[in-house]
Amino acid sequence: MRTPLIAGNWKMNGSSALVDAFGQAFADADLPESVEVVVHPPFPYLDAARRALAGGPVKLGAQTLNPLHAGARTGEVSGRMLKEFDVEYVLVGHSERRELYRESDDDVYDRLLAALNADLRPILCVGETLEARDAGRTRDVVLRQVGHALAPLEPAQRARVTIAYEPVWAIGTGRTATPEQAQEVMAAIREYQAGFDPALAQSMRLIYGGSMNAANAAELLAQPDIDGGLVGGASLKVDDFLAICHSAR
């Protein structure tokens, strides 16, 4: 049985007031015990979020990390540093990082490995552009990204990874993959995994990211191979994010 995971990615948004609002809301929220919830605020709010969420059901995540433990990398943050703030999860390979910061598949793998070595739980983001989808290359693009990141890992390392399928054309656009489109890709990822590790294919969580909101979450989460969501804009609205969490029960 795979535990549903709802992860809120604030991106470069939020404020101290929002951190406090989340802390208060989730302290009083009756979250389903069967659902795991994580929030990924920007780096400056990690400590405030740690304190605001302390003792509650919500775990803390980061949005990226540098592959190195330390060094001359101005503006960067290492996995070791994140652990000091009680961070448990970290995103790697988000489409915005791949596109805006030119992170290659090799870069994503390096960050994934760094996260695992720092005892963090990486959420590996994969997905295709609209051009690739229209060309019928969705499966090829997504499975290439998955394989490049996971194939070199040991089985115990792969077991710590969650995969987030985020069609690039559905991020921040208001467009959403239909439940059937999302399920088709998730099933392909699970089938690919089964080719070299059948047990892991059944236990690995696959979550959907791409304009998931309170209105469409239940239908997406009802698909057999969708085990949760990587939520962007809706994660900045406390009530909407709570509603999505309840949809995953």
Swiss-Prot record:
Coiled coil: none annotated. Pathway: Carbohydrate biosynthesis; gluconeogenesis; Carbohydrate degradation; glycolysis; D-glyceraldehyde 3-phosphate from glycerone phosphate: step 1/1. It catalyses: D-glyceraldehyde 3-phosphate = dihydroxyacetone phosphate. Belongs to the triosephosphate isomerase family. PROSITE patterns: TIM_1 (PS00171), TIM_2 (PS51440). Involved in the gluconeogenesis. Catalyzes stereospecifically the conversion of dihydroxyacetone phosphate (DHAP) to D-glyceraldehyde-3-phosphate (G3P). InterPro entries: Aldolase_TIM, TIM_sf, TrioseP_Isoase_bac/euk, Triosephosphate_isomerase, Triosephosphate_isomerase_AS. This is Triosephosphate isomerase. The active site is at H94, E166. Substrate binds at N9, W10, K11, G172, S211, G232, G233. GO terms for biological process: gluconeogenesis; glyceraldehyde-3-phosphate biosynthetic process; glycerol catabolic process; glycolytic process. GO terms for cellular component: cytosol. GO terms for molecular function: triose-phosphate isomerase activity. Its EC number is 5.3.1.1. Pfam families: TIM. Keywords: Cytoplasm, Gluconeogenesis, Glycolysis, Isomerase. It is found in: Cytoplasm.
